[in-house]
Amino acid sequence: VPPLDADLDLHFRHRIRFGRGLRDAGLDAALRELRGGGGFRANLLPIVDAGLLDARPDFADTLSSHLAALGDDAPAACAPLILPGGEIAKNDPAILETILERLDRERVCRRSVVLVVGGGAVLDVAGYAAAIFHRGVRLVRMPTTTLAQDDAAMGVKNGVNRLGKKNLLGTFAVPEAVVCDLDLLDSLSDRHWNSGFAEAVKIAVIRDRELFERIERDADAVRSRDRDAAEAVIRRSAELHWRHIVEGGDPFELGTSRPLDFGHWAAHRLESMTEHRLTHGEAVSIGIVVDSTVAVLEGRLDETSRDRIASTLASLGLPTWDDAAHDHHELLAGLEEFREHLGGPSGIALPTSIGASVDDARPDVDVVRHALERCATES
């Protein structure tokens, strides 16, 4: 038998919708498309972040009533499953098991729908469960934090933390739709509101000078939760993250670089080192400053741009250093762990100016150590 070779062309549609309120944000339209045909009506399991319910105790009932009102035009909704939010959702194996048991109890099949409403961690673990159950159940994401709406929900990755490592287990799976109800952001504390804008700064620094200048100019308004200022930043950041997935040529990260993880090797390690005392966005903010300093020391970025980046993050109420980072040896282990995750001669993204970057830099560890020392001195 001769060798058999063929290319597989796989087609996915990656839908992002923004609005205010469940209907305006596009939830109804998305679910009607997923109803099922030929006399078959799919079922739907809503999964809701408990953190949202702390601020809006009525939301689970509101969602259930809204889904029921769609009637036969949409999948048949089960009672919501409530999960704890934050990184515990990804750290605790019992939470993943709880989701899988509920999927099994509700007789969820590959034509069913999981609707996950929550922050990035809940989106991750619910998405992972959906991806591995029956080898893939259709997923609709409804992100409820600034970080999830301007970044995390736009990607096609899911995952959980195991063996003390961030996202050690995970999948790539394109959601059926991402529905961003901007009104849900009103439930956030100031700390978690601010935290999400670190990812907007990240994408602006490496991809979009105009967005960076908008954030720099409007930082006080964004921090004070001015709707127009914040929404403009969130929407543009989301679009840039989405465009990287659909136009960047490597949605499933088969290459040797992850430009959207600028600042993240340090961030992931700091989250672990502080036992998640730092939020993801706060850790990313510190990582951005560290890697911008590395870029300066390598002659890639000018000092003024580095200072503007750090100043903008601070103006958004985000940290630019943490005492945990004084343990340089432990923090630098995160760089090696980051490289191991990709495998091969992988590099990191470093800015060359505001709005531009190299995606595959390989700084010497002594340069990175020097950058950490400088950041510590300036803190």
Language-model features and meaning:
Residues P84-G86, V117-G119, G249, F262-G263:
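Glycine-rich beta-strand-to-loop/alpha-helix junction loops that act as flexible
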Residues R214-H329:
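Active-site segments that bind and position negatively charged phosphate/pyrophosphate groups
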Residues R17, G127-A221:
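A glycine/threonine-rich phosphate-anchoring loop and its flanking beta-alpha core
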Residues P2-D9, V48, A198-V201, R300-S379:
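C-terminal charged capping/lid subdomain of soluble metabolic enzymes
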